[in-house]
């Protein structure tokens, strides 16, 4: 295959657009259109060959190539339309419009306008309209669709006649036109000579009428234009032309000009004195200027005062009155009508702003609701971190190494006696297993020698201690805390028994436990077995 393959359409296109053609060969043009769809590259090859002839230096060849291009667009279908709506064709069009002959450019622009109208419903062929838009922005003018200029540009101009017979026929037509013109001139000359030798009857009557037609001026008239006649009242004016009923042409000693017919009279016997008593003078002053004053349209704006004033006037007007409306009322009504579109726009703006504020309000309420929800939730992680660092018990600074525990109360809770300055008392809730072990522990006699001689006292402290259910955490041993109702019932029953028994109650020994028997925070003693945790609540 050669490097530069020949275009199969070059020979036919050159023949259809030859410089020697005197008319379009439509048979060959239609054959080219049929040949386009026979191969896959047919549309591109045909368009390339046609545009090569459009760029020809001979305008006659370029015009024939544009005619062939229009025929291909009309007959070859969408396969050729896609090639026309390509970037290559757009660059070729720009080159032709910049360097081509004016007639060629006009015809190409007319074809593009026609194609834009045909391709407007197909989005794949929108490049033509975009190309026209870009060229218009660059200053290129395009004719309107269906205009006379577009039709004339699309029409093929008269081809240059190369046939001698055609040239001869054209020359004969020109000679015939010249002969007709000469004969008409001779007829006009003969008619003028006859009219000079033998005057016509109409001309004699007209001359006789002009010679005997005289009128007298009854008013003074001063010419305002150059072709008008100035005269005074009482002057005799010779009428030259009275074909116009309003303005006649007359002659005086001052010259010839036009004058109004109602300023003269045909009665020539009237005395000048009588005419002077009845005459009316009309004078025109150049200083007088007639101006039509039109009220300037006031700019429309929303004025509540004017609307209130109009409503007040309408309420005070009697509808049964036959008198016309006041001009002020009509003026205010017109102005209020002009405010209508502005009021509609203002309402739309207010509605839009109200919608935006409503959306913002919803967002703010959602944010506040989320904030309130987060604030009401238990800070579980912070409480856990705080309580994790606390020991299982609190040892008072004012107490020695041993702590005195009273007898086991009914609720099973042990109170640690501490310093009197302590503002809080800590309650320990021990599981039942530890309570049983504590109750069975053997206390040496030397631990508390004063036990036999002491009076038995109730093991209830004066300080009120709130029983709070403890929180259980993964790092601490769960403790059992009886329900508040059970604790309160047990405490009430014990107090009642104590009051009824009095001094006859048996003495209960106090257990004096050393600190070594209690669980230490850092000791090696194993914590009690974990139990099922109950509810977790924050400390009150």
UniProtKB/Swiss-Prot annotation:
Bilayer topology term: Peripheral membrane protein
Domain UIM, first and last residues per copy: 171-190
Domain VHS span(s) in chain numbering: 16-143
Tissues in which the UniProt entry reports expression: Ubiquitously expressed.
Gene Ontology cellular component annotations, sorted alphabetically: cytosol; early endosome membrane; ESCRT-0 complex; intracellular membrane-bounded organelle
Function recorded in the entry: Involved in intracellular signal transduction mediated by cytokines and growth factors. Upon IL-2 and GM-CSL stimulation, it plays a role in signaling leading to DNA synthesis and MYC induction. May also play a role in T-cell development. Involved in down-regulation of receptor tyrosine kinase via multivesicular body (MVBs) when complexed with HGS (ESCRT-0 complex). The ESCRT-0 complex binds ubiquitin and acts as a sorting machinery that recognizes ubiquitinated receptors and transfers them to further sequential lysosomal sorting/trafficking processes.
Sequence similarity: Belongs to the STAM family.
Protein name as catalogued: Signal transducing adapter molecule 1
Species for this entry: Homo sapiens (Human)
Gene, per the UniProt record: STAM
């Amino acid at each position: 295959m050669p490097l530069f393959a020949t275009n199969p359409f070059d020979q036919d296109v050159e023949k259809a657009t030859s410089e020697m053609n005197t008319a379009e060969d439509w048979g060959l043009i239609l054959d080219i259109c049929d040949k386009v769809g026979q191969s896959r590259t047919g549309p591109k090859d045909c368009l390339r060959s046609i545009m090569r002839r459009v760029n020809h230096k001979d305008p006659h060849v370029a015009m024939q190539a544009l005619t062939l291009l229009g025929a291909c667009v009309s007959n070859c279908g969408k396969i050729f339309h896609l090639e026309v709506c390509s970037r290559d064709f757009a660059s070729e069009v720009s080159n032709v419009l910049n360097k081509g002959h004016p007639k060629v450019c006009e015809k190409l622009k007319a074809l593009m306008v026609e194609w834009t109208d045909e391709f407007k419903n197909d989005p794949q062929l929108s490049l033509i309209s975009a190309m026209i838009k870009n060229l218009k922005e660059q200053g290129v003018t395009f004719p309107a669709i269906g205009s006379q200029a577009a039709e004339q540009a699309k029409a093929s101009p008269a081809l240059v006649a190369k046939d001698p017979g055609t040239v001869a026929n054209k020359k004969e037509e020109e000679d015939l036109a010249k002969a007709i013109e000469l004969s008409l001139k001779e007829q006009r000359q003969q008619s003028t000579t006859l009219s000079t030798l033998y005057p016509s009857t109409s001309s004699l009557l007209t001359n006789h009428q002009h010679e005997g037609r005289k009128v007298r001026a009854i008013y003074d008239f001063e010419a305002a234009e150059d072709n008008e006649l100035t005269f005074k009242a009482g002057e005799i004016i010779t009428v030259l032309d009275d074909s116009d009923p309003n303005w006649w042409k007359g002659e005086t000693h001052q010259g010839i000009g036009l004058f109004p017919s109602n300023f003269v009279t045909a009665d020539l016997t009237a005395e000048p004195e009588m005419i002077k008593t009845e005459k009316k003078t009309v004078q025109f002053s150049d200083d007088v200027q007639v101006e039509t004053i039109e009220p300037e349209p006031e700019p429309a704006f929303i004025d509540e005062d004017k609307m209130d004033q109009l409503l007040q006037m309408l309420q005070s007007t009697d509808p049964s009155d036959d008198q016309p409306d006041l001009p002020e009322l009509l003026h205010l009504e017109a102005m209020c009508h002009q405010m209508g579109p502005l009021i509609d726009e203002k309402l739309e703006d207010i509605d839009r702003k109200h919608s935006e504020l409503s959306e913002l309000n919803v967002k703010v309420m959602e944010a506040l609701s989320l904030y309130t929800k987060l604030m009401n939730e238990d800070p579980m992680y912070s409480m856990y971190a705080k309580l994790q660092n606390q020991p299982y018990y609190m040892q008072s600074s004012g107490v020695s190494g041993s702590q005195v525990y009273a007898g086991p109360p009914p609720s099973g809770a042990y109170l640690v006696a501490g310093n009197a300055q302590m503002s809080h008392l800590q309650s320990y809730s021990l599981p039942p297993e530890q309570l049983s072990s504590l109750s069975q522990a053997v206390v040496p006699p030397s631990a508390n020698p004063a036990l036999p001689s002491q009076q038995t006292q109730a093991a209830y402290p004066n300080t009120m201690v709130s029983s709070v259910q403890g929180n259980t955490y993964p790092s601490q041993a769960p403790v059992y805390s009886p329900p508040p109702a059970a604790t309160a019932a047990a405490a009430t029953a014990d107090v009642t028994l104590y009051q009824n028994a009095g001094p006859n109650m048996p003495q209960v020994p106090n257990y004096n436990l050393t600190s070594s028997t209690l669980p230490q925070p850092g000791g090696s003693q194993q914590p009690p077995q974990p139990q099922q945790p109950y509810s977790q609540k924050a400390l009150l």
